[in-house]
Amino acid sequence: MFYRYPINDVHIHLFDPKDIDECIAMVDECGYTNWTFLACTVIDSPFALAQNLLCALMKLKEGGRCQAFGSFHYNGDVVPDADDLLRQIQWFDQAGFDGIKMLDGKPGVRRRQNLRLDAPNYDKMFDYAQRTQFPI
């Protein structure tokens, strides 16, 4: 009974582009029919800036099997202002991403950013997401 159906509730973080083929091979071997790539731009890594590009690439390579959830860009740990976050979420939506992996609510990230999730910085972005039903 437990292994009769394929596992579909899975997300993957991929940090180095050289691991793309290995990631796809793992997805195939595990029998995932759908999976989600969650970009992570707040990592302390030279690959942080390329996370959203890698996320979009995996969505294209996987031909509909991979959902792409982008990640907001920050200036260090400073949360962008409301207009910048609005521009970012609109771009993700228009570029074909399936949603946002909003890392701001994770305890460690939130501690570094020192900003509550109900701060005005997020208002326009949350309004857009709610109005368009763009997943966060």
Placement of each model-derived feature along the sequence:
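Active-site gating/metal-coordination segments in enzymes
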Residues: 49-136
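An N-terminally biased module of ancient metal coordination in phosphate/nucleic-acid-related enzymes
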Residues: 1-65
